[in-house]
């Protein structure tokens, strides 16, 4: 409540003092009340007048702010906002003049200003005056804004009121286009509901037939209640019959919106008849209920769920209107609700019916809200409690759990006198977690067993327990199409219930006598027995039944294609799951192995399913207990990157074959499969891998170490990072991995520590740092400081160059890397700065190294199959790193820095046939020239390197220019920009002007070296 009060205070403050600073905060506070507008209604009579009273005296900016606040309040509580507006007719001229003088809106804020004034105008026109003198002007100014959809509703209200007050003779006086305008007619006819006598002479029979034609369409449904009332008073029975017939003909509409409109309009007609003709009302509602009961007699698959949905919505709307007789309420709750509360049907393996269950909850909620529940028998209320508890906790759809819980709250709040539940028990129910379905089953199954078990003899508890048991053992076990829920029910309801002291021998016998009528149902029963067997319930007897069902009743036909995608409720996938579970638990080592591998092939692509993770241990255990594995088939599946087979390599019973298979197939796998397999190695390292003969163990260890160098790139990006991450996790899980030969591992960890992937940085740091020097926030600066204490190495700078010279990066990542480096660099002594610069040049591959890497197939590691870091790509990272640090202000270097040697190295790089590298180097040349010029300020050779670079850039410009006949290419553009950059940075005007003139006159081919050198 304190939070609500604070929000209301915030809104009132924002409305009282409208300002840009508070504006968004006020709107956010208003929108917090979307789910419960009644709380906001309390302050609207004060807020709305405050907003509008000085509207016409405000600046345009403030008018827009006010209009936006008004619009947001209006969205939450439209009718209450309109009722709170000032109705003084003295405001009329101000509003009309504002709308008349208003230019066409150019922004949404402008439209909202118009909307506010049109809404205000529609309220003032309800005053008891005809406004004849304002009639034409009002229609004229309002019609200017008919092209803005948001303005249409208030404009229709304005026109309806004006026509109603001024065209008083006959309907034919209305403009012809308005006679078929449904939104306008809806507002217009609404005015006649309060003036039935006027309607009797205003509408002729012809007029009513015309309105009938307009209303009897999907667009005109909202007109039907008003037309029905006018026609009833007019005595036009043929129109009344046509309207009722229209409802009956359209109950099965495919449109959900149409079904809701039909139900809402039908309820309004019923409400009118309840007052005007009670006998007809009873007949109409009784027919609707009987028709619904009749619908539910058919099998679910043959029921028209659209018609059923509309019928349920109608019943709910009528119940909410508090006009449904108690005997009919009782019929609905006893004959309809028990059948619709779990309604579902399958359509092309998609389970439908949640809209039926939702409308069922709507009925229950409406009955309780209408206070009809006070007249219901305790037995009916107990039945409702049972259904709502089950649906709120265990329905597969979250939206149904929401609506069930809302109805359950109402029931417990309004009818507990009859239910007689303990207040502590109510608190436990209302505090239960039901949003996550598996967790809800896990926690709330136990809650129901505790609160409503047979030891609790209250009538409510007895009823809930009976319904809960029937739902668990009968409907959910054999009729539920949602196999995920069925499985959760077995895991968390049936097995614990049978195992607990609450069960009796008769209950277990009831379970043992279950029989299915299809392969899927037999699999469901078999799964229950397997879970009982797994939990040591009557093992010998259950084991016999499992074998009997499997051998006699599971006639599995493999019809599916391996690549087909299932959903969690696919019967065929569940059948496969149960058969595999049977093989696992019964220890069948002579199972149908060919069928098993087909199952593995089918299941492996289903990684997105919740059930997938349960397949993994089952398949692994079956493989581990098989005495004669088909290794040829295994190799085929591994080569096709079958994930489940890859995950199972470590579970193969033959140790020698397991090693042979791993070493031969690991390099052939995709990075994703390699990372999964390393994860499996992690789980088996201590119990299996570390116990292998030393040669095999060493090879496994070397593979993991080499995986730290996996930089495989695909269309999905750096997928090698998955392998690097998993290898680091394995090392972290087994501290003794790092004991011994650390010389080969630490340099790799040092490089990875500086790389851009946060998880790789964190894991590398944790492996390198001692427990006492752990850093909470792992930033670029903290990494630099940590490595400085440890001693910086070239491997570290290779990793840092990859981060700071990244081709793809976020602004924050790049800024952090470069800024942290510059701060670190400036903290060093001059000699350390020089050494660091030399290190950063040394790590750049030479042109010769790049050429050699292209000739030899050295990029793929034969041990792991991973791609080593691409030499050219790494070189580009290094060049970009140098460019960025100089671009960010690191211009003056140590005077002993070998600028000429650096230029020679970069010169050779830009000669290579690699466009991206060449362009990167050409972009760096001007930075190198500028840095050398400023660093060697006191040196006689200050200008030498700058001139060499300028000459080279000129050669590139001329060569490209000559080759393309004045068409600018990438290299030429970059080289030209570089020359301009040097001239501007060094402040030389003669050379700058010469280059500008050559560009303007297209005479770049004629420019001389003497024109551009310093």
From Swiss-Prot:
Any GO molecular function: beta-tubulin binding
Biological processes, Gene Ontology terms: microtubule cytoskeleton organization; post-chaperonin tubulin folding pathway; protein folding; tubulin complex assembly
UniProt cross-references to InterPro entries, sorted A to Z: TBCD
Function: Required for microtubule stability. Interacts with CIN4.
Note: Present with 704 molecules/cell in log phase SD medium.
PANTHER family tied to this protein: BETA-TUBULIN COFACTOR D (PTHR12658), TUBULIN-SPECIFIC CHAPERONE D (PTHR12658:SF0)
Protein name per its UniProtKB record: Chromosome instability protein 1
Underlying gene: CIN1
